[in-house]
Amino acid sequence: TDAARNFSRTDLPSHAERYDIAREFLDVTFKLWNGWEEGAIVREKATGRYSDEAKIHAANHKGKYFQVQGPLNIARSPQGRPVIIEAGSSPAGQKLAAETAEVVFTAAASLEEGQAFYRSQKQFVREAGRNPDHLLILPGVMPIVGRTRENAQETWNQLNELVDIDNGIEQLSARFGVDMTAYPLDGPVPEIGGTEGGQSRVKLLTELAARENLTLRQLAAVAAGSRGHRVIVGTAADIADD
């Protein structure tokens, strides 16, 4: 809800609609970038002509969420456009990435989860008619590096002692859309229904809590410490091998 107020709304659109908005937003953005042809900038000192207007085109976008005339009032970059990076692991997020992105940033609590996501995302890319090799997948990871494994573990233990559980509870409340302060810290993680927030991270945290039988306090520590990303503790060689 707080995020919605920064975008002229009082409440979040549904999860599905947010991805519809994102897809159309990218359509508009691509039209604006592509509105400048190669050679549109001429810089003719003799005539004072900066650009070739015949090579600059309006977007003329009239969609459900955006109406944009264009053209873009600045030239596109030498490479045409920046790299498109999408973050998300829900089916809707994977579909958007498959259609539009070069890189996906995701979270995977284990190697098996990461491999499953990789297979799923690459299949979405194939279904979008793109080469699967043209989309890179970057899973988040939190490395704790030490000269020895014992030293690394000691560092990780010290960091865990500094975790602010209240902050973790705030994060869980925001992610799940439920006031987690209403539940006992040392009790089980409550079963929460569907959310219109970020669904993939909620799914990851819920499955992690069930798999490792975490209490709410322990899950809050995970949320505050690693945000649900995989933690690897060890020497530099351990982490590289992992």
How would you describe each model-predicted region?
Residues 5-8, 96, 117:
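Short, solvent-exposed loop/turn and secondary-structure capping segments
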